[in-house]
UniProtKB/Swiss-Prot annotation:
<feature type="repeat" description="ANK 1">
    <location>
        <begin position="54"/>
        <end position="83"/>
    </location>
</feature>
<feature type="repeat" description="ANK 2">
    <location>
        <begin position="253"/>
        <end position="283"/>
    </location>
</feature>
<protein>
    <recommendedName>
        <fullName>Protein MGF 505-9R</fullName>
    </recommendedName>
</protein>
<keyword id="KW-0677">Repeat</keyword>
<keyword id="KW-0040">ANK repeat</keyword>
<dbReference type="Pfam" id="PF03158">
    <property type="entry name" value="DUF249"/>
</dbReference>
<comment type="function">
    <text>Plays a role in virus cell tropism, and may be required for efficient virus replication in macrophages.</text>
</comment>
<feature type="repeat" description="ANK 3">
    <location>
        <begin position="313"/>
        <end position="343"/>
    </location>
</feature>
<comment type="similarity">
    <text>Belongs to the asfivirus MGF 505 family.</text>
</comment>
<dbReference type="InterPro" id="IPR004858">
    <property type="entry name" value="MGF_505"/>
</dbReference>
<keyword id="KW-0244">Early protein</keyword>
<dbReference type="InterPro" id="IPR036770">
    <property type="entry name" value="Ankyrin_rpt-contain_sf"/>
</dbReference>
Length: 506
């Protein structure tokens, strides 16, 4: 319950002059040594009609003087109890502290309001269960460096504590305290600052880390070079250009940055450096981009830096494209509005040589490659499996398949490749009924292309058809063989002609 006097004091906003000094004193509105007190709104008081202070500041002063009546008045005017405790600590008025501290309950709530390190420590001591570690941690939170400086020697003997405080200061981005700890205490893991700087993306903290590192080691130190390299890799991986530039001030290789930037498609970093590096490096980066399956924009940036001049390293590029099964760069070179670079066939040849059937089919669909081209390449490279699978997929009808394969033989120069396709044709006919015309045409085809063994086999198969027509075919084949000097074909044709003559009734 408020007394009548308290109610008057709490709600009195009128000028005090008409009341007279005696009434002001009786109302408890007179502050000894300062003058009359008048409430000014919710946050300020006027002292002796001239001096305006915040209620909290006035409360702190009154408590430091031990003036319990004025403290009570200012609390009545919504003054914060925490400032009363601070003032009481300044004047060492423990009776006031005892009276009001229980209403707050936790000294840690007061600490952020204190500027004086001595009062700060005194306030912390109000909680008798707190340790020095608690004091140091709050000192870091509240930027109370003098507390740490006071106990610096004691801290140096506790490596675990120093490391804990150092990392805490880094997380709170308290640069002054970080600097003091780094230069004055034995921090066993200084590098923790960099991990925190990366997480917070705090370049100031990152730079401070290098300042502390260089206080311990030189830029020529092997460990320092290793640290720089790790930082460059991580910063470029995350696309942090400012961090990359900061690290490069102290050493490291731009190549390290570029390879990571390509791998993770950080074009901002690439664009910053790419036009200042030698062509050989750009070529390696393009190969790395293929391996990393980089984006279209990354490839365009790299290619534009060498003006799309691919000749010096086409072989290496094709090898990388086939090895990693990533064809985007082939497509980009083909899509150029001017001066298209067509590597489709060159890449296809490598694929046919080294890749599986599904991979080749995927490539054929992507670049609209006709099956004849693939089959010819497969024949030259002796890939029987591809000839069979691709021809079967392209032409389900066997006669249609034979027709296309025969056309390929006509247009091929590679002898072994032609033979392979012809054997494949014969293999198809083994499971297909051929009428006389089809069988005779195929026999003549083998004669024209000097496929002796296949010619013999087809001659045997043709004996089921009309022998007169067969003899005419063999004479035609003999004429072809003599014209081209196909000795074995001629001998075979001649042999079968004689045989037909022997078995035919006169």
């Amino acid at each position: 319950m408020f007394s009548l006097q308290d109610l008057c004091r709490k709600n009195l906003f009128l000028p005090l002059e008409p009341l007279g000094k005696h009434v002001v004193q009786r109302l408890g509105l007179y502050w000894k040594g300062h003058g009359s007190l008048k409430q000014m709104g919710q946050c300020f008081v006027c002292i002796d009609q001239t001096w305006i202070l915040s209620i909290h500041k006035a409360l702190q002063i009154a408590a430091s003087e031990g003036n319990e009546d004025i403290v009570k008045l200012l609390i009545l005017w919504n003054g914060n109890l925490k400032y009363a405790i601070i003032g009481a600590l300044e004047g060492r008025h423990y009776d006031l502290i005892q009276k009001y501290y229980n209403q707050i309950g936790d000294c840690h709530e007061i600490l952020p309001l204190i500027q004086d390190p001595k009062i700060y420590e005194r306030c912390h001591e109000l909680n008798v269960t707190c340790t020095f570690q608690c004091l140091f941690q709050h000192a870091i939170k509240d930027n109370m460096l003098p507390i740490l400086q006071k106990y610096g020697q004691d801290l140096n003997g506790n490596r675990r504590m120093v490391q804990l405080l150092y990392e805490m200061a880094c997380r709170l981005q308290n640069y002054d305290i970080i600097k003091w700890i780094g230069f004055n205490l034995q921090v066993y893991n200084l590098e923790a600052i960099f991990s925190i700087a990366f997480v917070r993306k705090d370049l100031t903290l990152y730079s401070l880390g290098y300042m502390l590192l260089l206080n311990r080691m030189s830029t020529e130190d092997r460990n320092f070079i290793s640290i720089i390299t790790r930082h460059l890799e991580y910063a470029s991986k995350k696309g942090l250009l400012d961090f990359v530039l900061e690290s490069l001030k102290y050493g490291g290789q731009v190549d390290t940055v570029l390879f990571q930037a390509v791998k993770y498609n950080h074009r901002k970093i690439l664009a910053h450096f790419i036009h200042h590096v030698p062509r050989e490096i750009v070529e390696k980066l393009i190969l790395h981009a293929v391996e990393s399956r980089a984006s279209r924009k990354t490839f365009n940036l790299l290619l534009s830096s060498i003006n799309y001049c691919m000749n010096p390293f086409v072989k290496k590029l094709l090898h990388a494209v086939v090895k990693h099964k990533f064809m985007l760069i082939i497509k980009l070179l083909l899509e150029r509005p001017k001066k298209k670079i067509n590597l489709v066939n060159a890449a296809l040849f490598k694929l046919v040589k080294y890749s599986t059937y599904p991979e080749i089919v995927k490539y054929m669909k992507e670049f609209s490659v006709n099956p004849e081209m693939v089959i010819k390449m497969a024949a030259r490279l002796m890939r029987v499996d591809l000839i069979k699978k691709i021809s079967k997929d392209a032409w389900e009808n066997k006669l249609e398949r034979i027709k296309h394969l025969k056309q390929m033989v006509h247009t091929m120069n590679h002898r072994n490749g032609k033979n392979l396709i012809m054997y494949n044709i014969y293999d198809i006919t083994g499971y297909t009924y051929l009428n006389a015309k089809e069988a005779f045409n195929l026999t003549r085809f083998y004669a024209v292309h000097n496929a002796t063994c296949l010619f013999k086999e087809m001659c045997k198969n043709c004996f089921v058809h009309d022998l007169i027509q067969l003899r005419e075919l063999l004479e035609d084949c003999l004429h072809i063989a003599n014209r081209h000097a196909y000795i074995q074909i001629a001998e075979t044709a001649n042999e079968y002609i004689k045989y037909i003559d022997d078995i035919t009734p006169k």
